[in-house]
Amino acid sequence: MIGLVGKKVGMTRIFTEDGVSIPVTVIEIENNRVTQVKDLEKDGYRAIQVTTGSKKANRVLKPEAGHFAKAGVEAGRLLREFRLNEGEEYTVGQSISVEIFADVKKVDVTGTSKGKGFAGTVKRWNFRTQDATHGNSLSHRVPGSIGQNQTPGRVFKGKKMAGQLGNEQVTVQSLEVVRVDAERNLLLVKGAVPGATGSDLIVKPAVKA
């Protein structure tokens, strides 16, 4: 089953009949419009390309304008692609709504996490701090040793060090679908999802469900 592109609206909570409070993230999923269908013969794999939302006319590049015009759909703010399974068929110009999640119990949500700028190892990787006293006057939050000696004579790739924190693609798996509001194009999922309010999200049926 394909996924859809949505937008993070924010968090709230809803109550069950027993009075239990459930924290939910509200995701607005406007109708996704199919701009291209890829097939095995021409592209080597089966997939659909979709767009959503809108874009100011003066912001649409000429190649984009031609691509959207060929599909007969309004120019959207982005393009995303979803692989098709056997038996799934879509046509160019078709509109796909949030209702495809009506029978889905859990979803995976992918977004871009909030950027935190340059961060040290304590904040970025949860390193322990060194002694506050006992002779330590300069190295309270430094990482310590980052390698060995002449052998191997280098720092191993992947070593956890200070650097950019956040602003990277993050996927949260198996979030429970609490409610699907087709009238308002809303999907409510239990828990938090990556990204700032207003950021784009990709919602897919959970692979581990």
Swiss-Prot record:
Keywords: Methylation, Ribonucleoprotein, Ribosomal protein, RNA-binding, rRNA-binding. GO terms for molecular function: rRNA binding; structural constituent of ribosome. Methylated by PrmB. SUPFAM superfamilies: Translation proteins. It comes from the Bacteria. The keyword Ribonucleoprotein applies. One of its GO terms (biological process) is translation. GO terms for cellular component: cytosolic large ribosomal subunit. The modification N5-methylglutamine is found at residue 150. Belongs to the universal ribosomal protein uL3 family. PANTHER family: 50S RIBOSOMAL PROTEIN L3 (PTHR11229), LARGE RIBOSOMAL SUBUNIT PROTEIN UL3C (PTHR11229:SF16). One of the primary rRNA binding proteins, it binds directly near the 3'-end of the 23S rRNA, where it nucleates assembly of the 50S subunit. Part of the 50S ribosomal subunit. Forms a cluster with proteins L14 and L19. This is Large ribosomal subunit protein uL3. It comes from Proteus mirabilis (strain HI4320). The lineage of its organism: Bacteria, Pseudomonadati, Pseudomonadota, Gammaproteobacteria, Enterobacterales. The gene is rplC.
